[in-house]
Amino acid sequence: MNKKIEKFLNDNKIKYEVILHKKVFTAIDKAATLKIKQKLSGKTLVLRADKDFVVALIPANKNLNKDALKKTINFLRKKLGNTAIKKIDFASETQIKKVFKGAKTGAVVPFGVVWRKVLFVDKSFLKEKAIFINSGDYFQSLKISPKIFQKLPDCFLGSFSKAR
């Protein structure tokens, strides 16, 4: 696991379990490998919101509803007195490598604050006791309580996933 992530978890007293597994690149593969339901496997998405980057976490069995996420972002920006974003799209691998230094594409950890980025978490995770998220490595995942997202700085909950 990335030392920066490990330090963040420990400094914030976040309880986690490292789960070792075969090499996986997607949240769906992670669910199959760990023999868990796809709704328990977190899919980390890096998006470009106009000129800013944000991180979103949704269940593996869902797709991102960009319009709903855009509304969530704009609601937050309005509360903070900022202008609304006009466009939201997935970041390219090149952008991810440049902005999220040390992160591996396909294994980005959903703790945006580590890179000074805002994290948006689909609130459907709050129904679960534990979820499995990226650790920053293709060979391991983190088992955590989704309740921690309610306490993290620069983390916002919303409904922005849709059925595949």
Predicted regions and their residues:
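Extended, low-hydrophobicity, polar/charged segments
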Residues: 1-164
